[in-house]
Amino acid sequence: MSLDIFLTNNLTNKKEKFIPQDKTNVRMYVCGPTVYDDPHIGNARPVVVFDILFKILKNEYPNVTYVRNITDIDDKIIKSSKENNISILDLTNKITQSFNEDCIYLNCEKPNHEPKATEHISEMIQMISELIKKGFAYENKKHVYFEVKKFKDYGKLSNKKLDELVAGSRIEVSNNKKNPEDFVLWNPSDTDEPSWDSPWGKGRPGWH
């Protein structure tokens, strides 16, 4: 017998009945780990929570596609690589393997797809270019920033207003920004750091 599924909608802060856009192919995307250090209990929580949801959905719908990304390029990864005298590739492969082993130990199923960030740099560059074209982002000194004020619904999911954001807390302060709350989409890389060619010079994606 089919059962109704209720999930908390962050936008309304209410429990609402789950109605998929396509009952023949339910899709879920989950933000995965940044693989710079050994997995900890904070990494395990979303794995378990969304594994439960995945299994419930599979019980109710014929096809469920579960995607969970791996962030394998990041400032923390570069820092850890240098501190431990290990290549970024060896470090990220080691931590990814450790993470997947922990998932097995927790009896969590593998997602259908587990894309690595570095496998999709070209798509990120295309998306950033489109944001610049539409006026939502800007380039300055080989950095590209998202201009938060241009997006009127920014903070809607977290119920925070733009003027409540404090520069210098979780927001990186930089003279390259138009506004303190703007966040980086593309960073220039130092000569000893991984980099990809882009319209703004060699660099790597930024995370928010």
Region locations from a protein language model:
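NTP-dependent nucleotidyl-transfer catalytic core
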Residues: 1-207
